Regions:
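Interdomain/boundary linker segments immediately adjacent to catalytic/signaling cores
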Residues: 1-74
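Active-site beta-strand-loop-beta-strand hairpin of nuclease catalytic cores
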Residues: 96-122
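Catalytic cores of nucleic-acid endonucleases
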Residues: 113-121, 125-187
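A short acidic/basic microdomain associated with nuclease active sites
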Residues: 71-97
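Domain-level recognition of nuclease-like catalytic cores that cleave nucleotide substrates
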Residues: 157-313
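Beta-hairpin (beta-strand-turn-beta-strand) motif
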Residues: 83, 107-109, 128
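Phosphate/oxyanion-binding active-site loops and adjacent basic polyanion-contact surfaces
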Residues: 58-62, 97-98, 135-139
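Short secondary-structure capping micro-motifs at structural edges
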Residues: 51-55, 88-92, 108-111, 146-151
Length: 313
C-alpha cells in the first residue's frame, strides 16, 4: 500500500459519519454527557467522546491495513466474532455461552494442501503490552477459552493462536507469554504466541510490508494534521440530519422525550431558536416519510419543503 492510498483512506475513515456516531452515543447513554456525578460540562464530555471515537477509528484503520495485506497474500478472512454455546455439563441448569471475539481468523494451508484441513490462524489484536500480572492472566485465560471453543468447531484443523501487539516498543509480558506457550505446546493444549509490530508478518515472510505501513503511520503522525480533531456541528451536519430522519422509533422518542436529560440534550446540541435546526428539519421530514403514500409523494413533498425553505432565506 503506497502512502497516498494510505492517507486518502485514513482521511476518509476519520471524517465519515462522525456526527452520526456521536448522536447515537448521546441518545443511548445520555448520562455520560449530562450527570451531576461527573465534574465536566457537556461540551467537555462531548469532546472526550468524539476524540475517543477518532482514536478507535484510527486503530481500526490500522487493523484494516493488516486485513488488506493478508487478503492480498491470498488468504480468505472468516467470521471472527460470534457466540458459541457449549454442551450442557452434568449439574448445569443452563449451557455456558462463550463469545469468540478475535480480530481475524483465516486458513493457512501448505502448498498443495487441502483447504478443509488447513491450519486455522486466530489473531487477537491489542495496541501494546503494558498489562499488570492480574490483567495479563485474565487476558491469557480468556484467549485460551476461546481457542478451546474453536478447536471444537474445527476438530480436523490445527488451531494457531496469535496475540499481536501493534506497538513494538513495549514487551512487558513477553516472557510470560513464551512460558505459557511452551507449557501448553508440550501438553498439546490450545495455546498462542505473542508477536510485536512487524514481527507478526514474518509468518508470511512479508515483514517489510508492515514496516512500510509503520512508516506510513509515522509520516501521517508527523504531518500534524488537525482536520479530524474538529467536532461536527450536530445542529447543522447533513449526515446527522439523515441519521435523525432514519432513527428507529425507540431512539427517536428518546431524543424528543420531555425527560430532563433529553430536554438538556436538545437545548445544548440544537439551536431551538432556528427553524433550520436539524431538530426541526427532522421533525418535518420524519412526518413526511411517515404519512406519504409512496416514494413519489415523499419526494414531491420534500422538494416543496426545500423550495419553501429557500424562499424564506
Amino acid at each position: 500500500m503506497e502512502y497516498n492510498q494510505f492517507e486518502m483512506e485514513l482521511r476518509s475513515a476519520l471524517t465519515t459519519g462522525n456526527g452520526t456516531k456521536l448522536l447515537y452515543k448521546i441518545i443511548d447513554a445520555p448520562y455520560r454527557f449530562f450527570s451531576p456525578l461527573q465534574p465536566f460540562n457537556y461540551k467537555v464530555k462531548l469532546e472526550q467522546a468524539f476524540l475517543r471515537t477518532q482514536e478507535n477509528t484510527y486503530v481500526k484503520f490500522i487493523k484494516y491495513c493488516a486485513e488488506y495485506l493478508i487478503t492480498q497474500y491470498g488468504f480468505k478472512l472468516e467470521k471472527s466474532s460470534f457466540k458459541y454455546t457449549l454442551p450442557l455439563k452434568e449439574g448445569e441448569e443452563f449451557p455456558e455461552e462463550v463469545k469468540v471475539n478475535a480480530a481475524m481468523i483465516f486458513r493457512q494451508k501448505e502448498n498443495g494442501g487441502d483447504e478443509e484441513t488447513a491450519d486455522i490462524c486466530v489473531i487477537y489484536l491489542k495496541k501494546r503490552d503494558y498489562y499488570g500480572a492480574k490483567e495479563v492472566t485474565k487476558l491469557h485465560d480468556n484467549i485460551i477459552k476461546q481457542l478451546e471453543v474453536l478447536r471444537m468447531i474445527y476438530p480436523n484443523n490445527k488451531i494457531k493462536g496469535i496475540l499481536w501487539f501493534l506497538d513494538n516498543d513495549y514487551h512487558k509480558n513477553v516472557n510470560f507469554f513464551n512460558e505459557c506457550y511452551d507449557k501448553e505446546h508440550s501438553f498439546e493444549t490450545p495455546g498462542f504466541r505473542a508477536y510485536y509490530g512487524a514481527q507478526f508478518f514474518k509468518i508470511f515472510d512479508k515483514e517489510e510490508d508492515w514496516l512500510l505501513v509503520e512508516n506510513h503511520i509515522k509520516k501521517f503522525k508527523n504531518s500534524n494534521y488537525d482536520y479530524f480533531l474538529k467536532m461536527p456541528d450536530l445542529d447543522q451536519d447533513e449526515d446527522v440530519l439523515n441519521a435523525m430522519i432514519n432513527l428507529n422509533e425507540t431512539s427517536w422518542q428518546k431524543l424528543i422525550s420531555p425527560d430532563e436529560v433529553y430536554a438538556n440534550i436538545r437545548q445544548y446540541i440544537f439551536n431551538e431558536r432556528n427553524e433550520n435546526s436539524n431538530l426541526f428539519k427532522a421533525l418535518k421530514l420524519r412526518d413526511i416519510k411517515r404519512t406519504s403514500v409512496d416514494d413519489d409523494e415523499e419526494k414531491r413533498r420534500i422538494l416543496e419543503l426545500e423550495n419553501k425553505a429557500n424562499q424564506n432565506e
